[in-house]
Amino acid sequence: MKVLMFGWEYPPHVYGGLATANFGIAEGLHAQPDMDITLCLPKPWGDEDRTFAKIIGMNCVPIAYRDVNYDYVKDRISHIMEPELYYKFRDHIYADFNYMNVNDLGCMEFAGGYPSNLHEEINNYSIIAGVVARSMDFDIIHAHDWLTFPAGIHAKQVSGKPLCIHVHATDFDRSRGKVNPTVYSIEKNGMDNADCIMCVSELTRQTVINQYHQDPRKCFTVHNAVYPLRQELQDIPRPDHTGKEKVVTFLGRITMQKGPEYFVEAANMVLHRTRNVRFCMAGSGDMMDQ
């Protein structure tokens, strides 16, 4: 099976959990027999692990025709993807995008990460997805989180292939129920157009069903996996805490989605029973001052 996957970040350039999850599912799919994954990223840097997926830099896909020679293209993009792909994509430009802000290769630039003009970059990404979908041979589309849902929808419209969206979180989770209408609209549009909705937890699945009004029959809970601890790490001797203060750490975003209030409640319960435990929180988020 050939998978056209749309992602927003990928190790080693990690801005959040999405990069790790994207890498993990690419690795897991690659381990299955007869799987071929093409992963589209806004701005790959060239040092990404390509063991499990062929990476396409959306900033190297032309949307406006430019007559450039092979050596120049090779010099510009060969650290990201094969120059031959540039010309393949150029042959599938589907509209006149010369009015867009493109570079000398006819490609759009991306800042990488989550810039202030994020919604503009999401739209640009979806435009480029139309070129990619017209050029590639694939069986299914996999779109990671709301940032890539418009791209996934465009690829489905172009190809007629089924769209599977991967909901790593919803705006209800990220905003404690105070949703951004624009983000909600993008999320719901992606869900409405999806043939399959993968949710990272049953809670997320119920949110998708109840808050986004989706058919439960196309919503599936697919939990994130964990890597077994390497043997050399298991063999490290554990320190002796006998008679010493024990330390329990919360490390992550201090936001509702990560449950920091449960950590505080647990600390309160434990400290009412024993005094040799110290609870430490490290991170930032909208619940920081509570």
Show the residue positions of the predicted features.
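Membrane-proximal helix-turn-helix segments that form the acceptor-binding/catalytic region
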Residues: 130-135, 157, 180-197
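A conserved catalytic-core segment of Leloir-type glycosyltransferases
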Residues: 33-133
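A short, histidine- and acid-enriched strand-loop-helix "catalytic/donor-clamping" loop
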Residues: 138, 150, 165-180, 193-196
